[in-house]
Amino acid sequence: MNESYRCQAATWVERGSSATMGGVLFSAGLLGNLLALVLLARSGLGSCRPGPLHPPPSVFYVLVCGLTVTHLLGKCLISPMVLAAYAQNRSLKELLPASGNQLCEAFAFLMSFFGLASTLQLLAMALECWLSLGHPFFYQRHITARRGVLVAPVAGAFSLAFCALPFAGFGKFVQYCPGTWCFIQMIHKKRSFSVIGFSVLYSSLMALLVLATVVCNLGAMSNLYAMHRRQRHHPRRCSRDRAQSGSDYRHGSPNPLEELDHFVLLALTTVLFTMCSLPLIYRAYYGAFKLVDRADGDSEDLQALRFLSVISIVDPWIFIIFRTSVFRMLFHKAFTRPLIYRNWCSHSWQTNMESTL
Protein backbone atom coordinates (compact mmCIF):
# COMPACT_ATOMS: atom_id res chain seq x y z
CA MET A 1 0.00 0.00 0.00
CA ASN A 2 1.45 3.33 -1.09
CA GLU A 3 0.82 5.43 1.99
CA SER A 4 1.77 9.08 1.63
CA TYR A 5 -0.09 10.34 4.70
CA ARG A 6 0.56 9.53 8.33
CA CYS A 7 -3.13 8.99 9.16
CA GLN A 8 -4.16 7.49 5.83
CA ALA A 9 -4.79 4.05 7.35
CA ALA A 10 -5.43 5.14 10.96
CA THR A 11 -8.33 3.49 12.74
CA TRP A 12 -8.40 5.76 15.82
CA VAL A 13 -8.57 9.51 16.28
CA GLU A 14 -5.09 10.86 16.93
CA ARG A 15 -4.29 11.68 20.56
CA GLY A 16 -4.52 15.29 21.65
CA SER A 17 -7.45 16.06 19.35
CA SER A 18 -10.65 17.52 20.74
CA ALA A 19 -14.19 17.77 19.42
CA THR A 20 -14.81 21.09 21.18
CA MET A 21 -13.81 23.27 18.25
CA GLY A 22 -15.74 21.12 15.79
CA GLY A 23 -18.87 21.31 17.93
CA VAL A 24 -18.62 25.08 18.29
CA LEU A 25 -18.10 25.57 14.56
CA PHE A 26 -21.00 23.27 13.70
CA SER A 27 -23.35 25.05 16.12
CA ALA A 28 -22.31 28.49 14.88
CA GLY A 29 -22.69 27.44 11.24
CA LEU A 30 -26.07 25.80 11.76
CA LEU A 31 -27.49 28.70 13.75
CA GLY A 32 -26.05 31.30 11.38
CA ASN A 33 -27.45 29.73 8.23
CA LEU A 34 -30.89 29.18 9.77
CA LEU A 35 -31.05 32.80 10.93
CA ALA A 36 -29.88 33.96 7.50
CA LEU A 37 -32.74 32.05 5.86
CA VAL A 38 -35.22 33.64 8.29
CA LEU A 39 -33.91 37.10 7.42
CA LEU A 40 -34.13 36.33 3.72
CA ALA A 41 -37.77 35.24 4.11
CA ARG A 42 -38.63 38.37 6.10
CA SER A 43 -36.98 40.62 3.51
CA GLY A 44 -39.55 39.55 0.93
CA LEU A 45 -37.98 36.56 -0.73
CA GLY A 46 -40.94 34.40 0.16
CA SER A 47 -43.61 36.78 -1.20
CA CYS A 48 -46.02 34.91 -3.45
CA ARG A 49 -47.93 37.96 -4.67
CA PRO A 50 -45.68 40.65 -6.08
CA GLY A 51 -47.23 44.07 -5.91
CA PRO A 52 -46.82 47.54 -4.41
CA LEU A 53 -46.65 46.16 -0.87
CA HIS A 54 -44.90 42.92 -1.81
CA PRO A 55 -42.26 43.58 -4.47
CA PRO A 56 -40.86 40.55 -6.27
CA PRO A 57 -37.59 39.15 -4.92
CA SER A 58 -34.47 40.54 -6.54
CA VAL A 59 -32.05 38.28 -8.38
CA PHE A 60 -29.39 39.02 -5.79
CA TYR A 61 -31.52 37.70 -2.92
CA VAL A 62 -32.40 34.59 -4.90
CA LEU A 63 -28.67 33.93 -5.29
CA VAL A 64 -28.00 34.65 -1.61
CA CYS A 65 -30.74 32.20 -0.67
CA GLY A 66 -29.21 29.51 -2.89
CA LEU A 67 -25.78 30.07 -1.35
CA THR A 68 -27.20 29.92 2.18
CA VAL A 69 -29.07 26.68 1.48
CA THR A 70 -25.87 25.21 0.01
CA HIS A 71 -23.92 26.17 3.13
CA LEU A 72 -26.63 24.72 5.38
CA LEU A 73 -26.76 21.41 3.53
CA GLY A 74 -22.99 21.10 3.61
CA LYS A 75 -22.85 21.81 7.31
CA CYS A 76 -25.61 19.30 8.12
CA LEU A 77 -24.12 16.52 5.99
CA ILE A 78 -20.42 16.90 6.86
CA SER A 79 -20.14 18.03 10.49
CA PRO A 80 -22.11 15.15 12.08
CA MET A 81 -19.57 12.66 10.70
CA VAL A 82 -16.70 14.59 12.29
CA LEU A 83 -18.48 14.76 15.65
CA ALA A 84 -19.36 11.04 15.48
CA ALA A 85 -15.71 10.17 14.87
CA TYR A 86 -14.67 12.16 17.93
CA ALA A 87 -17.48 10.71 20.06
CA GLN A 88 -16.56 7.09 19.26
CA ASN A 89 -12.81 7.74 19.08
CA ARG A 90 -12.71 6.10 15.68
CA SER A 91 -11.43 7.42 12.39
CA LEU A 92 -13.84 7.93 9.51
CA LYS A 93 -12.69 4.65 7.98
CA GLU A 94 -13.66 2.77 11.14
CA LEU A 95 -17.01 4.42 11.81
CA LEU A 96 -18.61 1.93 9.40
CA PRO A 97 -16.09 -0.94 9.13
CA ALA A 98 -18.33 -2.94 6.81
CA SER A 99 -18.30 -0.15 4.23
CA GLY A 100 -14.52 -0.15 3.95
CA ASN A 101 -13.31 3.19 2.61
CA GLN A 102 -16.69 4.35 1.33
CA LEU A 103 -17.52 6.68 4.23
CA CYS A 104 -14.17 8.45 3.91
CA GLU A 105 -14.67 8.82 0.16
CA ALA A 106 -18.19 10.15 0.68
CA PHE A 107 -16.90 12.70 3.19
CA ALA A 108 -14.14 13.85 0.83
CA PHE A 109 -16.60 14.07 -2.06
CA LEU A 110 -18.98 16.23 -0.01
CA MET A 111 -16.13 18.50 1.10
CA SER A 112 -14.94 19.07 -2.46
CA PHE A 113 -18.50 19.32 -3.83
CA PHE A 114 -19.75 22.00 -1.44
CA GLY A 115 -16.49 23.92 -1.69
CA LEU A 116 -16.77 24.13 -5.49
CA ALA A 117 -20.55 24.68 -5.61
CA SER A 118 -20.44 27.60 -3.17
CA THR A 119 -17.56 29.19 -5.11
CA LEU A 120 -19.55 29.01 -8.34
CA GLN A 121 -22.55 30.62 -6.65
CA LEU A 122 -20.40 33.36 -5.20
CA LEU A 123 -19.09 34.10 -8.71
CA ALA A 124 -22.69 34.29 -9.97
CA MET A 125 -23.47 36.84 -7.25
CA ALA A 126 -20.44 38.93 -8.22
CA LEU A 127 -21.37 38.74 -11.90
CA GLU A 128 -24.94 39.80 -11.13
CA CYS A 129 -23.70 42.80 -9.17
CA TRP A 130 -21.36 43.85 -11.98
CA LEU A 131 -24.03 43.50 -14.69
CA SER A 132 -26.66 45.40 -12.68
CA LEU A 133 -24.30 48.36 -12.27
CA GLY A 134 -22.32 48.35 -15.52
CA HIS A 135 -24.84 47.02 -18.03
CA PRO A 136 -28.33 47.92 -16.71
CA PHE A 137 -30.16 47.51 -20.06
CA PHE A 138 -28.74 44.03 -20.61
CA TYR A 139 -29.48 43.25 -16.96
CA GLN A 140 -33.13 44.32 -17.25
CA ARG A 141 -33.73 42.29 -20.39
CA HIS A 142 -31.87 39.08 -19.61
CA ILE A 143 -31.25 38.73 -15.85
CA THR A 144 -34.42 37.66 -14.04
CA ALA A 145 -35.26 36.00 -10.75
CA ARG A 146 -36.46 32.89 -12.61
CA ARG A 147 -33.06 32.52 -14.23
CA GLY A 148 -31.39 33.24 -10.92
CA VAL A 149 -33.18 30.24 -9.42
CA LEU A 150 -31.34 28.03 -11.93
CA VAL A 151 -27.88 29.06 -10.71
CA ALA A 152 -27.78 26.78 -7.66
CA PRO A 153 -28.97 23.63 -9.53
CA VAL A 154 -26.59 24.25 -12.45
CA ALA A 155 -23.66 24.89 -10.10
CA GLY A 156 -24.60 21.76 -8.18
CA ALA A 157 -24.80 19.61 -11.33
CA PHE A 158 -21.39 20.79 -12.56
CA SER A 159 -19.80 20.30 -9.14
CA LEU A 160 -21.36 16.85 -8.86
CA ALA A 161 -19.89 15.72 -12.18
CA PHE A 162 -16.47 17.29 -11.54
CA CYS A 163 -16.02 16.08 -7.96
CA ALA A 164 -17.11 12.55 -8.89
CA LEU A 165 -14.06 12.11 -11.16
CA PRO A 166 -12.08 10.26 -8.42
CA PHE A 167 -14.77 7.57 -8.43
CA ALA A 168 -14.00 7.10 -12.14
CA GLY A 169 -10.26 6.72 -11.51
CA PHE A 170 -9.04 10.29 -12.03
CA GLY A 171 -7.94 11.52 -8.62
CA LYS A 172 -8.04 9.95 -5.18
CA PHE A 173 -9.56 10.69 -1.78
CA VAL A 174 -7.51 10.16 1.37
CA GLN A 175 -7.90 10.38 5.15
CA TYR A 176 -6.12 13.26 6.91
CA CYS A 177 -4.94 13.57 10.50
CA PRO A 178 -6.30 13.38 13.15
CA GLY A 179 -8.49 10.82 11.36
CA THR A 180 -11.68 12.90 11.32
CA TRP A 181 -11.21 14.45 7.86
CA CYS A 182 -11.00 13.09 4.32
CA PHE A 183 -10.28 15.12 1.21
CA ILE A 184 -8.56 15.06 -2.18
CA GLN A 185 -5.08 13.52 -2.04
CA MET A 186 -2.58 16.29 -2.82
CA ILE A 187 0.73 14.35 -2.85
CA HIS A 188 1.81 10.92 -4.09
CA LYS A 189 5.11 9.06 -3.71
CA LYS A 190 5.15 7.84 -7.31
CA ARG A 191 3.88 11.12 -8.75
CA SER A 192 0.77 9.50 -10.16
CA PHE A 193 -0.64 11.71 -12.92
CA SER A 194 -4.26 10.94 -12.03
CA VAL A 195 -3.77 11.71 -8.32
CA ILE A 196 -1.68 14.86 -8.70
CA GLY A 197 -3.51 15.95 -11.86
CA PHE A 198 -6.94 16.03 -10.24
CA SER A 199 -5.61 17.87 -7.19
CA VAL A 200 -4.01 20.56 -9.37
CA LEU A 201 -7.08 20.74 -11.62
CA TYR A 202 -9.42 21.25 -8.65
CA SER A 203 -7.24 23.90 -7.04
CA SER A 204 -6.70 25.66 -10.40
CA LEU A 205 -10.45 25.79 -11.01
CA MET A 206 -10.97 27.22 -7.53
CA ALA A 207 -8.24 29.81 -8.12
CA LEU A 208 -9.80 30.81 -11.45
CA LEU A 209 -13.25 31.21 -9.89
CA VAL A 210 -11.89 33.31 -7.02
CA LEU A 211 -9.95 35.49 -9.48
CA ALA A 212 -13.04 35.97 -11.67
CA THR A 213 -15.07 36.95 -8.61
CA VAL A 214 -12.50 39.55 -7.59
CA VAL A 215 -12.41 40.96 -11.15
CA CYS A 216 -16.22 41.26 -11.23
CA ASN A 217 -16.21 43.07 -7.90
CA LEU A 218 -13.50 45.47 -9.07
CA GLY A 219 -15.63 46.19 -12.14
CA ALA A 220 -18.67 46.83 -9.94
CA MET A 221 -16.59 49.12 -7.73
CA SER A 222 -15.45 51.06 -10.80
CA ASN A 223 -19.06 51.47 -11.93
CA LEU A 224 -20.11 52.69 -8.48
CA TYR A 225 -17.36 55.30 -8.54
CA ALA A 226 -18.39 56.44 -12.03
CA MET A 227 -22.02 56.74 -10.89
CA HIS A 228 -20.93 58.80 -7.90
CA ARG A 229 -18.91 61.15 -10.13
CA ARG A 230 -21.88 61.67 -12.45
CA GLN A 231 -24.11 62.41 -9.47
CA ARG A 232 -21.64 64.99 -8.17
CA HIS A 233 -21.23 66.83 -11.47
CA HIS A 234 -24.82 66.53 -12.76
CA PRO A 235 -27.16 66.26 -9.74
CA ARG A 236 -30.19 67.69 -11.59
CA ARG A 237 -29.86 65.33 -14.52
CA CYS A 238 -29.38 62.32 -12.24
CA SER A 239 -32.51 63.23 -10.27
CA ARG A 240 -34.50 63.73 -13.49
CA ASP A 241 -33.28 60.45 -14.96
CA ARG A 242 -34.15 58.61 -11.78
CA ALA A 243 -37.62 60.14 -11.71
CA GLN A 244 -38.21 59.17 -15.35
CA SER A 245 -37.09 55.60 -14.71
CA GLY A 246 -39.00 55.18 -11.46
CA SER A 247 -41.32 52.62 -12.97
CA ASP A 248 -38.34 50.56 -14.08
CA TYR A 249 -36.98 50.47 -10.54
CA ARG A 250 -40.30 49.30 -9.21
CA HIS A 251 -40.30 46.42 -11.68
CA GLY A 252 -37.05 44.89 -10.56
CA SER A 253 -34.23 47.32 -11.31
CA PRO A 254 -31.95 47.77 -8.32
CA ASN A 255 -32.34 50.73 -6.00
CA PRO A 256 -29.05 52.69 -5.50
CA LEU A 257 -29.03 52.20 -1.72
CA GLU A 258 -29.97 48.56 -2.13
CA GLU A 259 -27.13 48.11 -4.60
CA LEU A 260 -24.74 49.72 -2.13
CA ASP A 261 -25.87 47.26 0.55
CA HIS A 262 -25.50 44.37 -1.86
CA PHE A 263 -22.05 45.44 -2.97
CA VAL A 264 -20.65 45.86 0.55
CA LEU A 265 -22.11 42.50 1.56
CA LEU A 266 -20.62 40.87 -1.53
CA ALA A 267 -17.24 42.52 -1.00
CA LEU A 268 -17.02 41.25 2.58
CA THR A 269 -18.02 37.76 1.52
CA THR A 270 -15.50 37.77 -1.33
CA VAL A 271 -12.62 38.92 0.87
CA LEU A 272 -13.48 36.16 3.33
CA PHE A 273 -13.73 33.56 0.60
CA THR A 274 -10.42 34.60 -0.96
CA MET A 275 -8.60 34.41 2.37
CA CYS A 276 -10.10 31.00 3.16
CA SER A 277 -9.52 29.51 -0.31
CA LEU A 278 -5.90 30.53 -0.86
CA PRO A 279 -4.39 28.16 1.78
CA LEU A 280 -5.94 25.11 0.10
CA ILE A 281 -4.84 26.28 -3.36
CA TYR A 282 -1.31 26.83 -2.09
CA ARG A 283 -1.14 23.43 -0.36
CA ALA A 284 -2.35 21.66 -3.52
CA TYR A 285 0.33 23.27 -5.68
CA TYR A 286 2.97 22.76 -3.00
CA GLY A 287 2.14 19.08 -2.71
CA ALA A 288 2.19 18.61 -6.48
CA PHE A 289 5.49 20.33 -7.25
CA LYS A 290 7.62 19.94 -4.12
CA LEU A 291 10.78 17.84 -4.40
CA VAL A 292 10.28 15.60 -1.35
CA ASP A 293 7.74 12.84 -2.02
CA ARG A 294 6.31 12.48 1.44
CA ALA A 295 3.60 14.18 3.48
CA ASP A 296 5.52 16.33 5.91
CA GLY A 297 2.80 18.93 6.37
CA ASP A 298 -0.23 17.12 7.76
CA SER A 299 -0.98 19.99 10.12
CA GLU A 300 -0.74 22.56 7.31
CA ASP A 301 -3.09 20.52 5.11
CA LEU A 302 -5.55 20.24 7.98
CA GLN A 303 -5.41 23.99 8.58
CA ALA A 304 -6.11 24.60 4.88
CA LEU A 305 -9.15 22.30 5.04
CA ARG A 306 -10.40 24.06 8.16
CA PHE A 307 -10.02 27.43 6.46
CA LEU A 308 -12.17 26.13 3.61
CA SER A 309 -14.85 24.91 6.03
CA VAL A 310 -14.96 28.26 7.84
CA ILE A 311 -16.57 29.92 4.81
CA SER A 312 -19.95 28.28 5.33
CA ILE A 313 -19.86 29.34 8.99
CA VAL A 314 -18.90 32.99 8.73
CA ASP A 315 -20.78 33.94 5.54
CA PRO A 316 -24.28 33.89 7.10
CA TRP A 317 -23.11 35.80 10.17
CA ILE A 318 -21.78 38.56 7.92
CA PHE A 319 -25.15 38.59 6.22
CA ILE A 320 -27.03 38.67 9.54
CA ILE A 321 -24.95 41.53 10.94
CA PHE A 322 -25.20 43.55 7.75
CA ARG A 323 -28.94 43.07 7.31
CA THR A 324 -29.88 44.29 10.80
CA SER A 325 -31.69 47.62 10.77
CA VAL A 326 -29.28 49.17 13.29
CA PHE A 327 -26.20 48.37 11.22
CA ARG A 328 -27.85 49.55 7.99
CA MET A 329 -28.92 52.80 9.63
CA LEU A 330 -25.41 53.47 10.92
CA PHE A 331 -23.87 52.54 7.58
CA HIS A 332 -26.17 54.84 5.62
CA LYS A 333 -25.58 57.68 8.08
CA ALA A 334 -21.83 57.24 7.87
CA PHE A 335 -21.49 56.92 4.09
CA THR A 336 -24.67 57.74 2.17
CA ARG A 337 -25.91 60.90 3.90
CA PRO A 338 -22.52 62.70 3.86
CA LEU A 339 -22.31 62.09 0.11
CA ILE A 340 -25.84 63.39 -0.45
CA TYR A 341 -25.19 66.41 1.77
CA ARG A 342 -21.92 67.19 -0.01
CA ASN A 343 -23.58 66.93 -3.42
CA TRP A 344 -26.46 69.16 -2.24
CA CYS A 345 -24.05 71.79 -0.90
CA SER A 346 -22.00 71.71 -4.09
CA HIS A 347 -25.14 72.06 -6.19
CA SER A 348 -26.48 74.92 -4.03
CA TRP A 349 -23.17 76.78 -4.26
CA GLN A 350 -23.13 76.35 -8.04
CA THR A 351 -26.73 77.62 -8.32
CA ASN A 352 -25.95 80.69 -6.17
CA MET A 353 -22.92 81.51 -8.29
CA GLU A 354 -24.97 81.23 -11.48
CA SER A 355 -27.69 83.52 -10.07
CA THR A 356 -25.08 86.04 -8.94
CA LEU A 357 -23.49 86.11 -12.36
Curated annotation (Swiss-Prot):
* TM region positions: 21-41, 58-78, 107-127, 150-170, 195-215, 262-282, 307-327
Which Gene3D superfamilies does the record associate with it?
Rhodopsin 7-helix transmembrane proteins
Keyword set includes Membrane: yes
Where, subcellularly, is it found?
Cell membrane
Against Pfam families, the record matches this protein to: 7tm_1
**Where is it mostly found?**
membrane
Q: List the disulfide bonds.
A: C104-C182
A Gene Ontology molecular function term for this protein is:
prostaglandin D receptor activity
Q: Specify whether Cell membrane is a keyword of the entry.
A: yes
Instruction: Tell me the membrane topology, using the record's own terms.
Output: Multi-pass membrane protein
Question: What ranges does the Cytoplasmic topological domain annotation cover?
Answer: 42-57, 128-149, 216-261, 328-357
Q: Which UniProt keywords apply?
A: Cell membrane, Disulfide bond, G-protein coupled receptor, Glycoprotein, Membrane, Receptor, Transducer, Transmembrane, Transmembrane helix
**Cellular component per GO?**
plasma membrane
Q: What is the tissue specificity? A: Strongly expressed in eye and gastrointestinal tract (GIT), moderately in the brain and oviduct and weakly in the epididymis. In the eye, expressed in the epithelium of the iris and ciliary body and in photoreceptor cells of the retina. In the brain, expressed in leptomeninges, choroid plexus and spinal cord (sensory and motor neurons of the dorsal and ventral horns). In the stomach, expressed in the mucous-secreting goblet cells and the columnar epithelium. Expressed in platelets.
Tell me the Gene Ontology biological-process terms attached to this UniProt entry. Answer: inflammatory response; positive regulation of cytosolic calcium ion concentration
Q: What is this protein called?
A: Prostaglandin D2 receptor-like
